[in-house]
């Protein structure tokens, strides 16, 4: 069966064409059924392809005269969407010339372009940015939203949970992902009205969906591996994500400094090197690269701007997996299963929840 192409914004990211093309070539070795649409400066892409014969015959170049800069405002980037590599990659998905787009460019611009060009799925009010985070368990943690929406009501959080669960079923091979809401405590009385209303709604909907809703979790428990999907608003999620990244860098720097402090420490490093290399691999963001904009009529994946070729390859591999497993159609099916209106309502945070409506009907 012919699989849709993956459009790669070859000009995005800190390292530009060389790393993006090399990353696509590495991913091609793992997913050799996929072909690529490389979008950007044609001459520079052709030059980069000379070192990757496995990709040359499996890709087409779409010349784009402009790029989106890292500090460009989304409104400005939108006006140039028809001529930039990022905008043209997303529009290729819109036109059906590619099944998904991958970019390491400006996150705000990518979000704005993707939302405008692809629109949200029926039953989804806002797309969410989701990523895989390392844990002590067997699987990575799916966490969303990580910055696309700074404020969310209960309705948004429930929609995020449904999308995150669909994502976790694919990337971690789970039948019924364990879903929790990020909160300042695990007690049912803790948190905002939006969080408590979302919890009530998810309890009511869990039976109709292949997920297990486990209530609330706290930020210090995200890495334990006892939950598969954590849902939050983009403001809290972005802070939690960057705190985890900062903690990982702190541990790595502390180990490096400790092992170089004396001759005995250096000898200790040599003895413990296998363990420290394993730790380094586990904490390396390149091994968990590829944040997905969930809730759109198409797949858009954001690679870290400073990702290595291996990191880009992992982002492309995530994209390929989501295309193979029909993520968008799975989310649509889950939304249809519960009914769009069932998750477009919420209690105190804006409307009546399914459970609240039932109580009122009973009282009447």
UniProtKB/Swiss-Prot annotation:
Give the span(s) annotated as Disordered. 343-364
What protein is this chain from? Phosphate acyltransferase
Q: Which UniProt keywords apply?
A: Cytoplasm, Lipid biosynthesis, Lipid metabolism, Phospholipid biosynthesis, Phospholipid metabolism, Transferase
**What the protein does?**
Catalyzes the reversible formation of acyl-phosphate (acyl-PO(4)) from acyl-[acyl-carrier-protein] (acyl-ACP). This enzyme utilizes acyl-ACP as fatty acyl donor, but not acyl-CoA.
- Which is a Pfam family this sequence falls into? FA_synthesis
Q: Name one GO cellular component term.
A: cytoplasm
What is the organism of origin for this protein? Novosphingobium aromaticivorans (strain ATCC 700278 / DSM 12444 / CCUG 56034 / CIP 105152 / NBRC 16084 / F199)
Compartment(s) where it occurs, according to its Swiss-Prot or TrEMBL record: Cytoplasm
Which reactions appear under catalytic activity for this entry?
a fatty acyl-[ACP] + phosphate = an acyl phosphate + holo-[ACP]
């Amino acid at each position: 069966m012919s699989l849709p192409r993956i459009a790669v914004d070859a000009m995005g990211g800190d390292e530009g064409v060389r790393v993006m093309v090399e990353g696509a070539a590495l991913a091609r070795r793992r997913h050799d059924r996929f072909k690529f649409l490389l979008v950007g400066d044609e001459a520079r892409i052709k030059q980069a392809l000379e070192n990757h014969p496995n990709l040359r015959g499996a890709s087409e170049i779409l010349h784009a005269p402009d790029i989106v800069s890292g500090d460009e405002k989304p409104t400005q980037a939108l006006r140039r969407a028809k001529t930039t590599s990022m905008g043209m990659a997303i529009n290729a998905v819109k036109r059906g010339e590619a099944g998904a787009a991958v970019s390491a460019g400006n996150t705000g611009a990518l979000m704005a372009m993707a939302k405008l060009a692809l629109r949200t799925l029926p039953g989804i009010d806002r797309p969410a940015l989701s990523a895989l985070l390392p844990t002590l368990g067997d699987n990575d943690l799916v966490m969303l939203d990580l910055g696309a929406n700074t404020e969310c009501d209960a309705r948004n959080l429930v929609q995020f949970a449904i999308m995150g669960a669909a994502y976790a079923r694919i990337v971690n091979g789970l039948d019924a992902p364990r879903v929790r809401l990020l909160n300042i405590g695990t007690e049912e009385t803790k948190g905002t009205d939006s969080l408590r209303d979302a919890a009530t709604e998810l309890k009511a909907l869990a039976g109709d969906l292949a997920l297990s809703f486990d209530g609330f979790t706290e930020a210090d428990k995200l890495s334990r591996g006892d939950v598969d999907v954590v849902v939050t608003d983009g403001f809290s999620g972005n802070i939690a994500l960057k705190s985890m990244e900062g903690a990982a860098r702190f541990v790595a720097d502390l180990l490096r400094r400790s092992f170089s402090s004396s001759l005995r420490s250096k000898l200790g490093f040599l003895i413990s090197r296998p363990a420290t290399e394993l730790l380094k691999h586990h904490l390396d963001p390149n091994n968990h690269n590829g944040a997905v904009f969930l809730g759109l009529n198409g797949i858009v994946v954001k690679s870290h701007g400073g990702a290595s070729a291996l990191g880009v390859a992992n982002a492309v591999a995530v994209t390929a997996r989501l295309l193979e497993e029909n993520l968008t159609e799975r989310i649509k099916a889950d939304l249809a299963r519960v009914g769009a209106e069932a998750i477009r309502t919420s209690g105190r945070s804006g409307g009546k929840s399914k459970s609240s409506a039932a109580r009122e009907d009973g009282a009447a």
